Amino acid sequence: MKIAVLSRNPRLYSTRRLVEAGQQRGHEMQVIDTLRAYMNIASHKPQIHYRGRALEGFDAVIPRIGASVTFYGCAVLRQFEMMGVYPLNESVAISRSRDKLRALQLLSRKGIGLPVTGFAHSPDDIPDLIQMVGGAPLVIKVLEGTQGMGVVLAETTKAAESVIEAFFGLKQDIMVQEYIQEAGGADIRCFVVGDKVIASMKRQAKAGEFRSNLHRGGSASLIKITPEERMTAVRAAKVMGLNVAGVDILRSNHGPLVMEVNSSPGLEGIETTTGKDVAGMIIQYLEKNAEPGQTRTKGRG
């Protein structure tokens, strides 16, 4: 197969591994810098050009679209879909999962366990917003943040009010979430491919920190997940419409709670921790499923 990898940086671990895994299995791999591709939106023959040439003959495309380039990245991916190229994750699913509020609303509608969450722009009653999610301690998040940025733990009501006011002063929409004390600063990253969790790891925040992101100095270790956690992760990915996803779960006193569904999960942490060939499993998934025009939207974007 001829497989495109949409990635801004061919030297990133995840991009390198996907290219290696594809080549080892006999596929032709090409990394395309998402922002440098440009498109012809003509109705009779949609095209993508890159480095002065039309991209042709691709069977599948693997989007590794960073949060900052979501809008243009999804447009390029949608153009591939219009050309009948099979996407590992569809553009509509990626944009859905990048909008944290929309993602939580969809998960909530399907009855998937979530922390109690409030959402606000400039509420006229901040104490009521805080009480609505069960009071302090609570977690306050800016909607656009990634890798643990824009996330604050407010341990007292006073602190929560100050943080919320500060964010509103910056004209930010925010999410206010109950703090799951019993998780002890740890979460579980479940790596879903198709309808299976193929690998999972526990991420533990470093001492004095509550964000377990590996970018924040958290540490990763092996963990055995329960059938309920496995089912929750697979269902969450399915609700978002993602074939490949990193689903972050907290262990709470009332079962697994989904924190986030990531449409472009990093491979380094999960492969290093588990020793599994996750990149190879992603390529195998494409081998089984890639057919021209086989998006849920039938290539209509």
Curated annotation (Swiss-Prot):
Domain ATP-grasp stretches: 104-287
Pfam families: RimK (PF08443), Rimk_N (PF18030)
Class in the EC hierarchy, top level: ligase
Cofactor binding annotation: Binds 2 magnesium or manganese ions per subunit.
Keyword Magnesium set for record: yes
Binding site for ATP: 141, 178-179, 187, 211-213
Keyword annotations: ATP-binding, Ligase, Magnesium, Manganese, Metal-binding, Nucleotide-binding, Protein biosynthesis
EC number: 6.3.2.-
Gene Ontology cellular component terms for the protein in this record: cytoplasm
UniProt cross-references to InterPro entries, sorted A to Z: ATP-grasp, ATP-grasp_RimK-type, ATP_grasp_subdomain_1, RimK, Rimk_N, Rp_bS6_RimK/Lys_biosynth_LsyX
Chain positions recorded as Mg(2+) 1 binding sites: 248, 260
Positions that bind Mn(2+) 2: 260, 262
Entry keyword annotation includes Iron: no
A single GO BP: protein modification process
Domain of life: Bacteria
Cofactor(s) required for function per UniProt: Mg(2+); Mn(2+)
Residues binding Mn(2+) 1, per UniProt: 248, 260
GO molecular function, one term: ATP binding
Residues holding Mg(2+) 2: 260, 262
Family per similarity comment: Belongs to the RimK family.
PANTHER family: RIBOSOMAL PROTEIN BS6--L-GLUTAMATE LIGASE, RIBOSOMAL PROTEIN S6 MODIFICATION PROTEIN
Protein name, per record: Probable alpha-L-glutamate ligase
Recorded name of the encoding gene: rimK
